[in-house]
């Protein structure tokens, strides 16, 4: 007999983990909706060229991590490795920037796939929540997105994080910086790994982005992008920093921060968890501005800015707060009966509370003893227990037990039906 198991780098969600996952999804969608974002859904796979062009063929995402396959028409497709490129493709294809007031503000919550070595906070199938503001150069939105990300973490009572920011220049000034990096790293190539030596020619920014290489002194002393910014770009970066200062959002300028995707040009930022549970995979929110991506995808010459949140990492960071922040669901009720002849009455009451009162109600469809009912209620994380017992029912009474506060009341049927 074959024993099937899930593929490496994937997880099964159920019980509390599934509940927390859905609550976090609902929290993120409802929070960003108040900022004027509307949800978009895109296919789980796209033509591979979309990601190759947007992320850059020399990026780890494209060269090592994408799940590629050919369809029956011999076309290369890829499972979605990140959310932004697919959203931009959908916006361009459906002409949303031409038929919608600008800026266009979109959010998404989607599964993504990357072939990486699994560890805490890094799976081969993971979930990404993201927002994109499209069709505006106004740097207020750079500030707004950082403020939104900061608000999300604060509302979740996550405090063990730092915010790092940097400014990646325009394509022209960036090319001058890249040339300077290539000259510098050629002089120090023996201090780099073989992979980084290859990247000197293909894309030296990936050396700065490499978690191990970035810790080396030779990489830390590499030419900085700030030396290649125009006066206008410096002024723009200073204005963003001033807005963050004015609203008491603490940040650190990290000139080695370039993000792992080639489409960024302008502000880039990362919210980095200091949780020991996420060592090595500590970025929980990352994003930035992209000036060329929409045009590269066949759309108008508009800019955009966005960020993505790794849901699995955020849940790990959230678990350290020791507070049940997400548990905002309505009370869960469990209906039980001690005597078989009360089964139909219990079923009727279950349906009334579900349909008329819109309560979260489950039922035990067998008469059983009290201790078994209480054990089951505990396993199901039930807060309120409604019990139909023969003696109390003869007096038109029903037992309501508050398992959270260890209280018990005898209520009439009308009082039970009045629960909201």
From Swiss-Prot:
Root EC class: ligase
EC number(s) reported in the record: 6.1.1.21
Matches recorded under Gene3D superfamilies: Anticodon-binding domain, Bira Bifunctional Protein, Domain 2
Coiled-coil residues: none
Keywords of this entry: Aminoacyl-tRNA synthetase, ATP-binding, Cytoplasm, Ligase, Nucleotide-binding, Protein biosynthesis
Location (main, coarse): cytoplasm
GO cellular component: cytoplasm
Statement: the UniProt record of this protein carries the keyword Nucleotide-binding: yes
Family: Belongs to the class-II aminoacyl-tRNA synthetase family.
Oligomeric form and interacting partners: Homodimer.
Protein name stated in the entry: Histidine--tRNA ligase
Organism of provenance: Ureaplasma parvum serovar 3 (strain ATCC 700970)
């Amino acid at each position: 007999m074959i024993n099937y198991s899930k593929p490496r780098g994937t997880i099964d969600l159920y019980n509390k983990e599934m509940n927390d996952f859905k609550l976090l999804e609902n929290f993120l969608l409802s929070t960003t909706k108040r900022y004027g974002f509307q949800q978009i859904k895109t296919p789980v796979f796209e033509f591979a060229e979309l990601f190759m062009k947007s992320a850059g063929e020399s990026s780890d995402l494209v060269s090592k991590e994408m799940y590629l396959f050919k369809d029956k028409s011999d076309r290369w497709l890829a499972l979605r490795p990140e959310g932004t490129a697919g959203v931009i493709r959908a916006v361009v294809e459906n002409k949303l920037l031409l038929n919608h007031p600008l800026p266009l503000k979109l959010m998404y919550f989607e599964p993504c796939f990357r072939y990486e070595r699994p560890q805490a906070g890094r799976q081969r199938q993971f979930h990404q929540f993201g927002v994109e503001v499209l069709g505006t150069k106004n740097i207020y939105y750079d500030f707004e997105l950082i403020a939104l990300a900061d608000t999300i973490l604060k509302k979740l009572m996550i405090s063990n994080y730092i915010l790092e920011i940097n400014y990646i220049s325009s394509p022209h000034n960036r090319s001058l910086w890249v040339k300077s990096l290539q000259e510098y790293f050629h002089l120090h190539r023996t201090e780099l790994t073989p992979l980084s030596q290859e990247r000197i020619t293909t894309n030296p920014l990936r050396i700065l982005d490499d978690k191990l290489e970035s810790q080396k002194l030779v990489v830390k002393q590499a030419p900085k992008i700030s030396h290649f910014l125009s006066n206008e770009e410096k002024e723009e970066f200073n204005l963003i920093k001033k807005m963050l200062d004015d609203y008491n959002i603490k940040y650190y300028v990290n000139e080695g921060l370039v993000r792992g995707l080639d489409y960024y040009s302008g502000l880039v930022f990362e919210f980095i968890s200091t949780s020991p549970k996420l060592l090595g995979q500590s970025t929980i929110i990352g994003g930035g501005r992209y000036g060329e991506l929409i045009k590269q995808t066949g759309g108008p010459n508009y800019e955009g800015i966005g960020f993505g949140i790794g849901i699995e990492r955020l849940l790990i960071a959230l678990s350290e707060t020791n507070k049940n922040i997400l548990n905002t669901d309505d009370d869960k009720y469990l209906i039980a009966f001690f005597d078989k002849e009360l089964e139909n009455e219990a079923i009727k009451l279950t349906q009334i509370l579900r349909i008329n009162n819109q309560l979260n109600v489950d039922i035990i469809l067998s008469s059983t003893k009290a201790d078994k009912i209480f054990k089951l209620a505990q396993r199901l994380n039930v807060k309120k227990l409604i019990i139909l017992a023969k003696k109390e029912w003869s007096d038109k009474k029903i037992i309501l037990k508050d398992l959270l506060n260890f209280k018990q009341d005898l209520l009439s049927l009308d009082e039970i039906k009045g629960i909201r």
